[in-house]
Amino acid sequence: MAAPVGPVKFWRPGTEGPGVSISEERQSLAENSGTTVVYNPYAALSIEQQRQKLPVFKLRNHILYLIENYQTVVIVGETGCGKSTQIPQYLAEAGWTAEGRVVGVTQPRRVAAVTVAGRVAEERGAVLGHEVGYCIRFDDCTDQLATRIKFLTDGMLVREMMVDPLLTKYSVIMLDEAHERTLYTDIAIGLLKKIQKKRGDLRLIVASATLDADKFRDFFNQNETSDPARDTCVILTVEGRTFPVDIFYLQSPVPDYIKSTVETVVKIHQTEGDGDVLAFLTGQEEVETVVSMLIEQARALARTGMKRHLRVLPMYAGLPSFEQMKVFERVSRSVRKVIVATNVAETSITISGIVYVIDCGFVKLRAYNPRTAIECLVVVPVSQASANQRAGRGGRSRSGKCYRLYTEEAFDKLPQSTVPEMQRSNLAPVILQLKALGIDNVLRFHFMSPPPAQSMVQALELLYALGGLDKDCRLTEPLGMRIAEFPLNPMFAKMLLESGNFGCSQEILSIAAMMQIQNIFVVPPNQKSHAIRVHRKFAVEEGDHLTMLNIYEAFIKHNKDSKWCQEHFLNYKGLVRAATVREQLKKLLVKFQVPRKSSEGDPDLVLRCIVSGFFANAARFHSTGAYRTIRDDHELHIHPASVLYAEKPPRWVIYNEVIQTSKYYMRDVTAIESAWLLELAPHFYQQGTHLSLKAKRAKVQDP
């Protein structure tokens, strides 16, 4: 088919490209800490009428029949078919929550667990937290006696198994959005298969928005004969309301999909009929860039006398809910809506009125390189499954068109599906959880997609260095078990547990809590320089960790005042959440009898404590003007958002995480003394042969 925009070349992720920015989300990606809205197009109808309008309603009795007769049911249904909100209610109505039993529904994202729980509670006329509740990290909104439908993240389900390995209170577990194949979805999948062998009465529903159902069926089906009548797993497809979508490819690649997205929107607006536009990009920064460019284009078109106007709206998980709701608002016939979104709009929400889809062909994923032991966010080409999901967004209300900003040949070379997180993540938290659940031989654990052996070895080495595993790779007592109990990266857990010994548990609690929050700084586009000047008042020469401590302490000193946050361009909701997280972490420190101590303003105590947890993330300034990791000599740079950026580079630093755009950038960076690494982590920098040991020691010792 004809190409919608002109010929140019693709840029490769990892090279300098105008479509990529260094101001990116935290490792968690914005979905986990943002707000997701639940849009209801049938709000004018009664609750019962609304429920009956959903495609899944026609299959209610059939779904209940299959759950009664099969241990596992794989349900394939597009976003908006009602599977997430209705199936748990069908189960409750059919008696699966009688006699104190619970239906559990997992979500890969915290915000989805909260918002879907809220919608189900509303439909049932219940108070959220009573019959219907949710449980996410640092926030348990359930009643142990009353809750019968429980929404929770897959990570929290795995944590529940540490207390109740057979999940005895649950009659049914529904793994929702299983196609996302997150780290903890995959662990839950493997563990639930083990539980099913011991609990024949436990029913499992695997809900997916993509056609990967065969993989799930093959994994869970315990029928070892050739007789299909003995299958324990079955697939059911919920037909949605879809229309054909014409696909348009480029004739030759483009170098800048940001610019091409804008050009394609303008071309659609000038040449195509009615219908709204949905454009997919990789992150918040790109979305905001395209929105501002399109607003300029819309003004220019209005000046030419064009009667139909453009209403340009952003959509990403970190956007406040009232801003997200704007994408669902109806507009007059003289206005065309253009929604510029991240992949949150791929399967998480359904927006009516979309006829035209623009797919940039890329997505931002977390990726771990076991050779360098660096985990970072990286922009990579989408999978064919994701590209098809994106295209399908244009065929919900009538036939649509999808403009792919890449060639058909490029599409044919895309991977069929996204690589599961299990095969591209740092596995230290996974191994720790499995060990805590009594699975000693993690290499033989039944993973749906086995992780690379090198990643497993790296994770075991880090956990041994942290003191969480002994030389036989068994969980240590009490340190290993305690690290496993923290709902945090093992490095954070070790830092917190050591804080009493360093005499700074009060400060470390605040720092750890602040590091879990995304986007503490607010930078309005029209007040950028002023906001940055105000932010500098909190900065200290030691780096980002103590700067975050300063901000938190100032917030508490000013009685958590929202007006004070506004005046200082700080994220009020984020700081309130940091205070909540801190309280939860404090309870764990009390449980483990970590002394309540303050450093009384001595920064070295705090910095040494941080090194005790994050020694593996150390880098040294090199004569080339960049930093180098100590163990494998990998090049890193200080992120422009760091208070250390544009200052005289410290010789030695530690960092929380790395993101990759045009370079590898360290985020949350703090200056340290090299001697602290040898003092606090000799076991990490003294492994291997005598020769390599000498080389490592030489690297860490200042000349």
Curated annotation (Swiss-Prot):
Task: Write down any Gene Ontology CC term.
Answer: catalytic step 2 spliceosome
Domain Helicase ATP-binding intervals: 64-229
Enumerate the SMART domains for this protein: DEXDc, HA2, HELICc
> From the record, which residues define motif DEAH box?
176-179
Give all residue intervals belonging to the Helicase C-terminal domain: 261-438
**One of this protein's GO BP terms?**
mRNA splicing, via spliceosome
- Which EC number(s) are documented for this chain? 3.6.4.13
Q: Per its UniProt record, what Gene3D superfamilies does this chain match?
A: 1.20.120.1080, P-loop containing nucleotide triphosphate hydrolases
GO MF term set? ATP binding; ATP hydrolysis activity; helicase activity; RNA binding; RNA helicase activity
Family per similarity comment: Belongs to the DEAD box helicase family. DEAH subfamily.
Question: Its quaternary structure?
Answer: Identified in the spliceosome C complex.
Mind telling me what this protein is named?
Probable ATP-dependent RNA helicase DHX35
What is the species listed in this Swiss-Prot or TrEMBL entry? Homo sapiens (Human)
What is the name of the gene encoding this protein? Answer: DHX35
